[in-house]
A protein has these predicted regions:
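Extended alpha-helical solenoid scaffold regions that build the rod-like backbones
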Residues: 205, 243-246, 251-264
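Alpha-helix capping and inter-helical loop/turn segments
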Residues: 6-10, 39-44, 72-75, 159, ...
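Amphipathic alpha-helical elements of HEAT/ARM-like alpha-solenoid repeat scaffolds that form extended
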Residues: 28-36, 64-73, 106-116, 145-161, ...
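Alpha-solenoid helical repeat scaffolds
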Residues: 42, 74-76, 117, 121, ...
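N-terminal alpha-helical scaffolding segments that mark the starts
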Residues: 1-46
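Amphipathic alpha-helical segments within extended alpha-helical solenoids and repeat-rich scaffolds
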Residues: 5-9, 41-49, 84-100, 123-147, ...
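Eukaryotic helix-linker segments that join adjacent hydrophobic helices
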Residues: 58-102, 109
Length: 286
């Protein structure tokens, strides 16, 4: 069976390379598309695609495998056996965890999208660990690559689950909305801690307020802060993603669920930092 899989993988790699070759004629591309389409329609194509995805270094094959898996997730998911769904879910998560620092961004983002699409159907009933996986990635003190991945997953989750498309039932859309609202206090607190860490604050579990505590009162002065210009590239990248997540959350969630005085203070600090950066650039250029 392994030899058959290897032979099929080599054949697929050759087909994909031929398809994207500038020397390939349109008629030949049409033939290849028909072959690939016939393969994708097979009921066991998902299992082959998991093998192809985890065994190739060919980006075309990776993307074809993910696109085929996307079809199963969108069109056949409910009718699949639970064990098969779990295998797809586990393999995609493991592959993303192992390759998110080396895979091209378009492949990484596709993986994130498929995992969130699975959660759209399975969370929390068959995929209870979905949100805890994301939150573990965005913990303060994690590696920049893990934080970036977690924030990308948070943004995609907000886009897909906070404002679900019309291709799911009304009851499921309402359930997802409620589930997302329940997660917002912890998400907001995490985003604030990441933004504060980017500005240089010493943030620790012992000194940070819990998500349930009302420790964001405007009467409580913020801890002292010293910001050096410019921000490090990692801090800047993390801050940009954090702010994108905050902006999208506010596009659908009530402000009372995700806005605290602590978040507002931090946003003002970033606004002031941007002004200082512009002034500094002007003085240097002048």
């Amino acid at each position: 069976m392994t030899e058959d899989n290897s032979a099929n993988l080599r054949a697929l790699e050759a087909l994909m390379d031929e398809f994207f070759s500038p020397a390939t004629t349109n008629s030949r591309k049409a033939e290849i598309e028909k072959l690939l389409g016939s393969f994708s329609e097979q009921s066991t194509a998902w299992k082959d695609c998991l093998y192809f995805l985890t065994s190739t270094s060919n980006q075309y094959v990776c993307m074809f495998s993910l696109t085929t898996l996307e079809t199963f997730i969108h069109q056949r998911w409910v009718g699949m056996f639970g064990a098969d769904r779990a295998e797809i879910r586990t393999t995609l998560n493991r592959f993303l965890s192992e390759h998110h620092t080396t895979a091209p961004q378009f492949i990484r983002n596709k993986l994130v999208k498929l995992i969130v699409d699975i959660a759209r159907s399975d969370w929390p009933h068959f995929y209870p660990e979905f949100f805890s996986q994301i939150m573990s990635l965005v913990a303060v003190g994690g590696s920049p690559s893990s934080v970036e991945l977690g924030l990308t997953m948070l943004l995609t989750t907000s886009e897909e689950l906070g404002t679900p498309r019309e291709d799911i039932s009304t009851s499921r859309a309402m359930e997802l909305h409620k589930l997302m609202l329940a997660q917002l206090p912890s998400v907001s607190a995490c985003l604030v801690r990441l933004l504060e860490a980017g500005l240089g604050r010493e943030v620790s579990n012992s000194s940070s307020p819990s998500d349930s505590e009302d420790s964001d009162s405007m009467d409580t002065p913020p801890p002292p802060l010293t910001v050096s210009l410019p921000l490090s590239p990692a801090s800047k990248d993390s801050a940009v993603l954090c702010l994108q997540v905050v902006a999208h959350l506010l596009s659908w969630a009530p402000a009372s669920h995700c806005v605290s005085s602590r978040l507002i203070r931090t946003l003002f600090l970033y606004a002031a930092l941007e002004v200082r950066s512009q002034v500094r650039s002007y003085l240097i250029s002048g």
